[in-house]
Amino acid sequence: MAVPHWTPADIPSLGGRTALITGANSGIGYRTAQVLAERGARILLAGRRPASLAEAARRLRADVPGARLETVELDLGDLSAIRDAAAPLAATETLDLLINNAGVMDVPERRTTSDGLELTVGTNHFGHFALTAHLMPALARSTAARVVTVSAIAATWRSGDLDDLMSERHYRPMGAYAKSKRANVVFTQELARRLDGTAHRALVVHPGSAVTNLQRHTSSGRMGRLFVALAARTLMGTADGAAWPTLYAATHPEAVSGTFIGPAGRDQTSGTPKPVPLPARADSPGQGAWLWCESERLTGVPFPALQT
């Protein structure tokens, strides 16, 4: 059910709360950081390129005078870099919100991360899985932490089936992207099950169709051009409106753990956030347990329990 009149103006004060946002230097991530900072949250801007992070911090301080923020250099395609970036935060921080927002899309040819994982799923899913695992001690210090992972409408595509997760038998750029986004949903469902009975929540969102810097990672190939063209014809939104599902999931007091949140408008392209149907089998405990075990095995990162 959509929340008919909800807008980011309804977000309560977030003073005393800390949020880490990946991919926060532009697009949906930047807009999310901006709104949370306006509500008083302390923001940790996480991104791969130091120069882009510094520019984002400069812009955010100009947009939100008095904003409390820091930058975290983080390459989600490098498991060692994730571990090193997360270690000091896990040791000292109290993290109330973790927003797994960064992503890559439509890599033209099959490539791998520095750890040998297919690049798209390695960044979009395995990188965020490892980051979340490493940050669990910081999340556990919060009285009510939330992990919000940004998926995409592509999670519902048939090509998003998790068979051949690493695209070893057959690689298609948008198929790999759909798999990574389906994995985001399945991961969140399993995390929500593991958080059941605690004060903590895990939610997954999709932003509809938005013109953001993710399109800069889109190839000039036929599928990439087709995706952007179709999105443009379906009222492709801006990062402002596309950030609403993330902001709702991160802040609304009644947001339910395990829910998939997307826009309420036609074809889920834009509009007020609402719970939307999960992709096929995404809530299967068997598939969730399988992906969890595969993620621990392939990343070498054991996922600790998060207690109340």
Go through each PLM region and give its residues.
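C-terminal helical subdomain
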Residues: 180, 229-276, 285-289, 293, ...
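Polar helix-capping/helix-linker motif
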Residues: 78, 164, 251-252, 281-284
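Short, flexible, mixed-charge acidic loops at enzyme active sites
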Residues: 160-165, 217-222, 261-274
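Rossmann-fold NAD(P)H-dependent dehydrogenase/reductase core
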Residues: 1-220, 298-306
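Generic alpha-helix initiation/capping and coil-helix boundary signal
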Residues: 26, 49-50, 113, 235, ...
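Pocket-edge positions in alpha/beta enzyme catalytic cores
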Residues: 45, 74, 234, 280-283
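Short, contiguous pre-domain boundary segments
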Residues: 1-6, 270-281
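Flexible internal linker/loop segments at domain or repeat junctions
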Residues: 224-226
